[in-house]
């Protein structure tokens, strides 16, 4: 049904409040139960790596992605990456990574880290320009309203018609 496009396993986090230890039986159920979904950030170890041997095309990475170098350090060249601009040290590093991925046909999608205000506008602008049709996790502010109106923007997000810098107006 395409209702689930990405499943985040949180296996790359260590020492945080969102850590999820590797769970081979759960990973196997996810792989089999959601055959079309991307699988984000599995923890790869002796027990779990074999589960993903035939699933490289579905594995996407988020937490470790901060630069071109971190993409190159992945266990295999990915087909998908979750780009969270707030993880990059500079706009230059962000754009170098996007360019690197475009040159290698690595598909991108956008993610956020609870950005509100101007940060949310930035991730919308980037998503609309570089990965508008991807399974983005960058909902417009209106979706966070406790009483949303019926006039919510739909995907894909269109780029701003009169952009100023990275603003979304």
What annotation goes with each model-predicted range?
Residues 131-132:
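Short helix-capping segments at alpha-helix termini
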Residues 144-169:
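C-terminal extensions of enzymes
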Residues 1-113, 117-125, 136, 144-151:
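Catalytic core of soluble alpha/beta enzymes
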């Amino acid at each position: 049904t395409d209702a689930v496009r990405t499943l985040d396993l949180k296996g790359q986090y260590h020492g945080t409040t969102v850590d999820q230890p590797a769970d081979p039986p759960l990973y196997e159920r996810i792989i089999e139960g959601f055959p079309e979904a991307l699988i984000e950030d599995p923890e790869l170890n002796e027990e779990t790596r074999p589960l993903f041997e035939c699933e490289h095309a579905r594995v996407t990475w988020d937490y470790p992605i901060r630069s071109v170098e971190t993409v190159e350090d992945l266990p295999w060249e990915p087909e998908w990456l979750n780009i969270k601009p707030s993880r990059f040290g500079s706009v230059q590093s962000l754009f170098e990574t996007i360019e690197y991925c475009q040159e290698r046909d690595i598909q991108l999608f956008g993610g956020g880290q609870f950005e509100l205000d101007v940060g949310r506008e930035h991730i919308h602008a980037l998503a609309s320009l570089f990965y508008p049709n991807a399974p983005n996790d960058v909902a417009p502010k209106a979706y966070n309203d406790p009483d949303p109106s019926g006039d919510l923007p739909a995907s894909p997000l269109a780029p701003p018609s009169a952009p100023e810098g990275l603003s979304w107006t």
